[in-house]
Regions:
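A general structural detector for well-ordered alpha-helical segments in enzyme core domains, enriched
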Residues: 1, 30-37, 63-67, 91-95, ...
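Mid-to-C-terminal alpha-helical segments outside catalytic/metal-binding sites
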Residues: 1-9, 182-185, 199-234
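Conserved, mostly hydrophobic/aromatic
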Residues: 2, 34, 67, 76, ...
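Active-site gating/metal-coordination segments in enzymes
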Residues: 9, 18, 24-107, 113-114, ...
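Conserved residues at the C-terminal ends of beta-strands
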Residues: 13, 79, 139, 189
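Flexible loop residues that form catalytic
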Residues: 15-18, 81, 141-142, 161, ...
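Short helix-capping segments at alpha-helix termini
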Residues: 39-44, 130-134, 152-153, 181, ...
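Catalytic pocket-lining loop regions of alpha/beta-barrel enzymes
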Residues: 74-75, 85-187
């Protein structure tokens, strides 16, 4: 599939739920599975470390260090809505401190439905202020709280949210939203195979059709498609 769509390299994101990504149901097993996928298909995947909030913060930090140093993983994924732990909860503070110190990119799920959601954009702002220089990737662009993220030094990926923006705002306004972040902050992402409205087989064609209607130059499209991610992840 990747070859058919001219995708040279993809990012595998865990879900902060080891029951979904291993048969041993442990975060270490998830990390080994991700390592094995990277090794089986060399040069084709980035993969982010998982967290399991059944473990202590210290245990999660140790597992991330092993995932990055021992398994060759490329970042950390935090999905507050799956863990049930608010992004700015003290549980996550040692994880952010490690990422800040080691300059490890952190991808944060943010598709909040309320102003007090565990992944609300305001919690991302609070975290960024507490840990300056943290390399943040906000997945789903903070959904419909995107304006809160505009002042932050963070990257945003358009996974899941791009078709929802078009459905809500139309192409022109969606184009304006993407432009408001600046091309250098935008990351192409699809959340494949998941989507609230589209079946997996229609996902990429839908994304391509939407982006083809926007005013990005060829050079800007390359930055969004892969250059920004390459600079961030190596």
């Amino acid at each position: 599939m990747m070859d058919a769509l001219n995708i040279e390299k993809a990012v595998i994101m865990p879900l902060n739920d080891p029951w979904l990504m291993s048969m041993e149901f442990t975060v270490d097993a998830v990390h080994r599975n991700l390592r094995d996928m990277k090794q089986t298909y060399p040069g084709r995947f980035y993969a982010f470390a998982d967290i399991d909030t059944r473990n202590t913060s210290a245990q999660s930090v140790d597992a991330i260090i092993q995932a990055v140093d021992g398994c060759g993983l490329d970042g950390i994924k935090i999905h507050p809505n799956n863990t049930g732990v608010a992004l700015d909860d003290e549980y996550n503070a040692p994880i952010f401190a490690l990422a800040q110190q080691r300059k490890i990119p952190v991808a944060i799920h943010s598709y909040p439905n309320t102003e007090d959601d565990v992944s609300v954009a305001a919690r991302i702002v609070k975290t960024a202020e507490r840990f300056p220089g943290l390399q943040l990737i906000v997945s789903h662009m903070g959904a419909f709280q995107w304006e809160t993220l505009l002042p932050l030094e963070c990257s945003v990926d358009m996974s899941a949210i791009l078709p929802d923006y078009v459905r809500t705002y139309g192409i022109a306004k969606t184009n304006e939203i993407l432009r408001s972040f600046g091309v250098d902050r935008l990351l192409f992402a699809s959340d494949y195979p998941d989507n609230r409205h589209l079946p997996p087989e229609e996902l990429y064609d839908s994304y391509f059709a939407i982006l083809d209607q926007m005013d990005f130059t060829a050079e800007e499209a390359e930055r969004i498609a892969y250059q920004n991610a390459k600079e961030l992840l190596g």
